[in-house]
């Protein structure tokens, strides 16, 4: 029982670690352990106020690094959504609750990034993370329904 909770916590800590790493490049593993520096001028209001960078589109190009970053967002947050799902009790709305937990964590993670020099939090990444969670939960939902319908057809 505790194993599932530990795994979801480790996944959340892993995501937070990468979010706390400035100038992170997926294509350059030497950047995966950069020391972080807090932006002491940043405030929650300066991040979330209308017109802030949080709502802007990406200013960097569409290259291999960009594609790998977005694939990492989709896959890491997709797995996290599944872990949230497996940690919830068997209740109605379990898929939705797992997705809402995932979306909330994605939002908080992007806010966290906005406080780190060399990182930027974007609402677009919250949407990509949430899409990744929805996609993985959709695959799980279809897998479970196919499995259930096969059992029903055998009867």
Task: Please place each PLM-identified region on the residue numbering.
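Bulky hydrophobic segments
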Residues: 1-114, 123, 130-147, 151-155
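Sequence-specific DNA-binding recognition helix
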Residues: 120
